[in-house]
Amino acid sequence: QELSRRISTATGIKATTSLTAVVDALRVLGIKRPAIATSYLADIDARLVDVLQQSGFRVAGIRGMGLKRSIDMGKVMPEETYRLACAVARAATDADGIFISCGNLRSFEAIEPLEKDTGLPVVTSNQAGLWQALRMAGVQERLPNLGLLLRDY
């Protein structure tokens, strides 16, 4: 959030980051205990948990794919992302939402099925970034098929 503020101050233009958008999306959906699916290695997952805890969230569970290279993250099919997110949500029985972290994961196709099958709201890095960029640009149009966040907020 500090980076976004510094960019905005220096340029006079609204700015955001993926993580700022995610935090705002989790808050607007009322998610306090996310179950998190990532493409990352354990050390990156641990840093993500720290940042989210510092932002007031209690991470209900996290599971990563253990991928190192961005190119490999981009090759993950949405069905794999769906399965991982379902598994971490099932394991984290007190989760009140799902967060899929990684801008390289093809997660858009998994959002609606996850929300339907788990009954939990879903936030992904790319979905949150799109949502925040649209709202910052003054676009209020609701988008179907991309989950509760873009459909209702």
Map each language-model feature to its residues.
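Non-catalytic structural scaffold of enzyme domains
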Residues: 1-153
